[in-house]
Amino acid sequence: MKLTGAEILCESLTKLGVRHIFGYPGGAILPVYDALGKSKLHHILVRHEQGATHMADGYARASGGVGVAMATSGPGATNMVTGIATAMLDSSPVVCITGQVSSKLLGSDAFQEIDITGITMPITKHNVVVSRAEDIARTVREAFVIANSGRPGPVLVDITKDAQQASCDFNWEASTPKLPPKRQRINYEPADFERAVELLNNAKRPLILAGHGIMVSGAMRVFDQFVHAGNLPVAMTLLGIGCFPASDPLNLGMMGMHGEAWVNHAIQEADLLIAVGMRFDDRVTGDLRTYAKEARKIHIEIDRSEINKNVKVDAALIGDAREVLEQLLPRLEHRERGDWLGHIRELKGDSAVKDIQGLPDNGHLTPRTSSTISGKKPVAKPSWSPTLASTRCGKRSITTTISRARW
């Protein structure tokens, strides 16, 4: 079946399960927009290309799939940079498709030509220029695999205008990705695993630092089992909020700069920190010279480059959070930890953020403990649910994340 490169792109996205695309048209991407009208894809027109990447990022986070954004060459592509960087830093699977000048004009400083692959190299997992219609299907398939594998992140596919306009035979089955062998999802030595087990079972004052990686890996259920099997208190990063029910007594809430002081004090007094899917960001640790000096540290992290980057750890378990926790769970010994948990309650005292377990159904709320959405009654005891909460940045996001009802 002969199709144009633009039609092949639309057909490939449809076969990959894409339903929505966020984009803004322009000269170098117009052939794709012509093809979109004949496809099953729903295009959402944005007012600025930066919005397209942010919307694709949000769509990926909300749906659990890959978000797709589209723009033209030059200023259209450069306008996407902030959204791409956000997706990279927050490990969000986004595929950005940009138009490019015709291949014969590459390198000539043609109208709206820009080296967008060079610009985005530091903020993408992978990017590529496609100058032949025959390569579009395979490249798009590769982009989706890369964006959604390992530590998720953005991929940019830059397609020249002549590749969009050219026609060729389309064979989806033959367009298999040419990628290196898949890495193991667990990649650590048995000695590291045994060291982690020993530290876990010998700790008197353990504390879990829960991050976004728990949700990315779909580890919420096994994480819940792991926490209760070891009776382990949990502090969360901002992006980790939602990985563990706020109604659980072992949930301490958010740590770090915008968290509660008593949570940070508990971290400083712990003798073991178990970091799961988090990167010891400066908003979490503060001054590294004084951060949890008495604590041994276990780091469960899929990205090897994050190990010992900010904080030196005693045991590194490199791999998918869900699979690592599934291996650790049978080896974890239960402890009552009455003294340690009691001490944490004493540290908490009359904190401004109260336990969600004691929240009255119609209690009065302050800005600091606000948990309403559109003026509705506060949610008293949320647990596992598909509820999603979204805020603007700045103070609104912080007051929401430290509120009684955590999402």
Label the model's feature ranges.
Residues 1-338, 353, 373, 377-383, ...:
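N-terminal alpha/beta PP-like core and its mobile active-site loop of ThDP/TPP-dependent enzymes
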